[in-house]
């Protein structure tokens, strides 16, 4: 058990953990590919939507971290069908700024501005966050990147284009209690 473990035990565990941790970008890319083929009723599948969102952000000159957040903003769809923004944000949290994390975490509510009224919800639900330092950033993300990225006629970069950016962002955690214990 962990209670009876020793430093020697943890040296072994950490040594075995490091290669696993370094493979995180590979697992993220594999999971992102799972979004392909499922459109959920939209004109594009979830992978194409993610690629379109990231392409729009990249073409607009957003930094690599922001582009990776755009790419992964819906990666939670497969395992978090009822709370995908929370799942996506949890994956990103150790590696991105607080502003980008908040944007991904809240994007579902902000995106609702465009459709909640059609499903019996309050389209102004995002107003509860009015005045938050990241309100405008998140509203902008949904308005100019997430919302338009359902157009099947729009050109998007392939996943391989974003891979170096993703690997860079996920190269080392900056917001984790473990960041100083396991050098990746």
Can you say where each PLM-predicted feature lies in the sequence?
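Metal-dependent phosphohydrolase cores
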Residues: 1-71, 75-184
